[in-house]
């Protein structure tokens, strides 16, 4: 069966682990054949009362087990599917997760699923978004990117785990000094602030230093962010995150909370400069990634990061079966 190259939309859903059964049930009801799932963690700031009863608050970090689900559909089905998943999983409630769609080119032997969904009102979907992805060694000298992102109020980071290959494999004995484990930080941010936040993340996270990792941004077609940056003690009737989410809903945009002006504005020239590369993702069965990585290195790629996912089959005789990939 030949490989087909076509335009598609990749849907990425990041939810709390407790919603896993509900996600699978909802996707099955939409007649989707399968979905890729990845274990991850969602990091938020944890606000606690000060020591000895003082009024000052202490700030820490709290991890919550999360799942990242990925599937590709026809581009015309992306927005209706986003709306259906947001409604079915109640993602407009802060803390339940985030979702977004990106336009991609896909090469696969499998046909894109036919989804029959009614066209729904999508005014509350945000379209002025960008995805910042950072890949950093777990034992790196710089501060963790997710901590920097939370301190900057950039958004709620979702962190996955991967194994670095490519450059490290060429270092010989020196590679024992570099941990192969990588943290993959996924961060949805307003598109108009993406340049400024990317610059701050690079500086504060020491990404521009040798061994500091790398960071890049990709455009988002539409999505819904999770505004719950902080959990724990709350001193007012509504948190600042709830207020921001309400204003986003009223304004139908995040442009009102622009943080960087002047040199950080995204002009036509800046937009072209930001997207000079392409992200290439291979999804294969476990044990086949080495050949793909080797081919990528021979074609000129500087490195690759391998993550472990699983394919969840949702229909037919294989429904409920999970295969590592």
Q: What is the meaning of each model-derived region?
A:
Residues 1-325:
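Positively charged, small/polar-rich N-terminal and surface patches that mediate targeting and assembly
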